[in-house]
Amino acid sequence: MNNHPATLRNESSFNYWKSRIQNHDKFDEIFELTTDRQRCTPDEVKNNSLWSQYMFCKPFAPTTLKSYKSRFIKLIYCLIDDEYLNNYYDTHTLNKEFNSIVQQQPLIKPEELCRRMLELRSVTKETLQLTINFYTNTMNLPEYKIPKQVMLPRDKEIKNIKNNEKNIVLREIINTILDCIEKKIKHLSSEFVHDRGLIRGAIVFCIMLGTGMRINRSRHLSVDDLNTLIKRGKLRQAIGLKRKKHRTSNSLNSIKQKPLELAREIYIKNPNILNISKNTSTPFKDFKRLLKEANVEMDRPRSNMIRHYLSSNLYNNGMPLQKVARLMNHESSASTRHYLNKYDVGVDESDDNDEDDDDDENDDRIIDENPSGANISNYDINNSSSGNSSSNNTSGNDFNNNISSGDDADLLSFN
């Protein structure tokens, strides 16, 4: 084994120490202290004898705490001296590292932390900077910025992947996945544990494609929600999802019935399949497994490629950038421009009559409309023949009193 310092910090070593760090008797207490130090409270408030006693600290979101915990564990690991690192039988207690955090007495400089982090694994410049910020806030150190001229190996790798992604034709990928769902996955049963991930992935994928919702919002829809979407073309119902304050409604309007009908068909046979923990990575794992099952090869598969596909088609078919931005709930069109044409969406001139819409990744309101007879040229996304697309039907649904009127939905062109 090579004992050069550059090989001391690796995944095997980290996994061993990660367990010991998390099991330390002071872990929870010091993690809470460290987390609290990430708050940016203005000095004029913090040092004011009157207002400081009334300060209210807004709780961190679960996802933020999850990120902080990951950084905290890596920080403690990087504080361990090299001499103790690979001596697994040593009685090193980690008290030195934890106490340095409490007392704000740095054991290493920020630059050394960078070196040790890069020794552990290849990370992006952004990830490394976030870890450094976490450290300097924790230890009350001056701000440390990685030089602008720096491009780390992981950044170069991602840049190459993004360049390759421009040649990926999303239309072909979507058709391939839908074909796999139609011919194979919809016939599977959740009675077999091994098949459950594929079934979940198929249902959520079809909902995303039919509504433009993000993956974590798609999995919250019920069979009743799908029935309403398919029957009326839209749904207004509070489903307990976070939305921006200026939104006054929580509307879900169906664009394309075919994917939703396919989702419903599978969902009805497996009604409890989406009952999974709220804060879980399961939907993303299911999505990747779905792509693998369909023999779709991508360097960096991401569920939001569907939203890229929808929004790019809206823009390419002539919708003004500002309107696409508004529908995606972006603060500025610059944010939306970042979404557009990152992939080859596979547009052709025969698709100009399609109707569709998209939703923002930070909002749960989907404004999608599927007018009766809308033509979508894609085999698996088109030919909705149910005849239930009328949004004027007001009977036989659990959400009769919550259905939004047609005049509050935008009609969108889509490929």
From Swiss-Prot:
Protein name: Very late expression factor 1
Keywords: DNA recombination, Transcription, Transcription regulation
Active site (catalytic residues): R214, K242, R307, H330, Y343 (o-(3'-phospho-dna)-tyrosine intermediate)
Pfam families, sorted: Phage_integrase
Family in the record: Belongs to the 'phage' integrase family.
Keyword hit for Transcription: yes
Tyr recombinase domain boundaries: 171-357
Renumbered residue ranges of the record's region Disordered: 339-415
GO terms under biological process: DNA integration; DNA recombination
A molecular-function term among this protein's GO annotations: DNA binding
Biased composition (Low complexity): 375-404
Segments of skewed composition (Acidic residues): 346-363
Domain of life according to the entry: Viruses
UniProt source species: Heliothis zea nuclear polyhedrosis virus
Gene name in the database record: VLF-1
